[in-house]
């Protein structure tokens, strides 16, 4: 079943979620960006980028025929696609720094 969502309402919700995420990550730096390597947790820096990738992938790139097939950030699929990036490798990826990751949002 395909659900129709008003594009303006969706855009507003996505902006609100990014603003909320910005508040959550405001104090992250250094070791807090990667955190401990645990089987039940992703690195925070990876999760932040994954939020941007997820919104881009599902809301822009797969929204309609003719949507752009490639990510806006070169290599983003190889970094943030949780279906293809094994969990235990996410700490070792060449992730962008926090400022670049915030820009991706």
Q: Which ranges hold each PLM region?
A:
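Membrane-entry segments of alpha-helical transmembrane domains in multi-pass membrane proteins
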Residues: 6-10, 37-48, 98
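Alpha-helical transition-metal enzyme core signature, strongest for iron centers
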Residues: 14-21, 44-58, 80-87, 102-105
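Short, helix-capping/interhelical loops that line the mouth of catalytic, cofactor-
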Residues: 1-9, 58-105
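Helix-loop segments that flank and shape redox-cofactor active sites
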Residues: 19-43, 60-69
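Glycine-/proline-rich flexible loop or hinge segments
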Residues: 32-42, 55, 87-94
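Generic start-of-chain signal for non-secretory N-termini
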Residues: 1-26
């Amino acid at each position: 079943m395909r659900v129709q969502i008003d594009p303006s309402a969706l855009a507003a919700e996505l902006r609100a979620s990014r603003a909320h995420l910005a508040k959550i990550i405001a104090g992250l730096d250094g070791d807090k960006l990667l955190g401990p390597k645990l089987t039940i947790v992703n690195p925070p820096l990876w999760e932040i980028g994954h939020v941007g990738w997820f919104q881009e992938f599902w809301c822009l790139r797969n929204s309609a025929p003719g949507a752009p097939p490639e990510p806006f950030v070169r290599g983003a699929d190889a970094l943030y696609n949780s279906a293809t990036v094994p969990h235990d490798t996410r700490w070792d990826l060449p992730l962008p720094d926090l400022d670049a990751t915030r820009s991706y949002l």
